[in-house]
Amino acid sequence: MIKENTYFEGGVKSLAFNQSGADVSVGVMAAGEYTFGTAAPEKMTVVKGALIVKRVGDDDWTTFQSGESFDVAGDSSFDLQVKEATAYLCEYL
């Protein structure tokens, strides 16, 4: 089953699905700034564009480009700065 999700008044849209027992989502973020909370650990991969990320405990912002990934701890949060529309893959670990 595919589930459509909309966050931040339409600024972020994703399609969530399960593949071989693993929950996954793919989506697009419009330019803007966002804070996401996590329940489970996540691996985020930038598909097209760039995400500027600051996770809990990080001192500095880090830019991840197309093809690059970053992990986020469960029961945590992370801040994002998006300069232009960016596509991503989120794997729930």
UniProtKB/Swiss-Prot annotation:
Swiss-Prot/TrEMBL keywords: Glycosyltransferase, Transferase
Annotated GO CC locations: cytosol
Transmembrane segments: none
EC number annotated for this UniProt entry: 2.4.2.1, 2.4.2.2
Reactions the enzyme catalyzes: a purine D-ribonucleoside + phosphate = a purine nucleobase + alpha-D-ribose 1-phosphate; adenosine + phosphate = alpha-D-ribose 1-phosphate + adenine; cytidine + phosphate = cytosine + alpha-D-ribose 1-phosphate; guanosine + phosphate = alpha-D-ribose 1-phosphate + guanine
InterPro entries assigned: Ppnp, RmlC-like_jellyroll, RmlC_Cupin_sf
Pfam families linked: Ppnp (PF06865)
GO molecular function, one term: guanosine phosphorylase activity
Top-level taxon of origin: Bacteria
Function per UniProt: Catalyzes the phosphorolysis of diverse nucleosides, yielding D-ribose 1-phosphate and the respective free bases. Can use uridine, adenosine, guanosine, cytidine, thymidine, inosine and xanthosine as substrates. Also catalyzes the reverse reactions.
Family that this chain belongs to: Belongs to the nucleoside phosphorylase PpnP family.
Protein name, UniProt field: Pyrimidine/purine nucleoside phosphorylase
Gene: ppnP
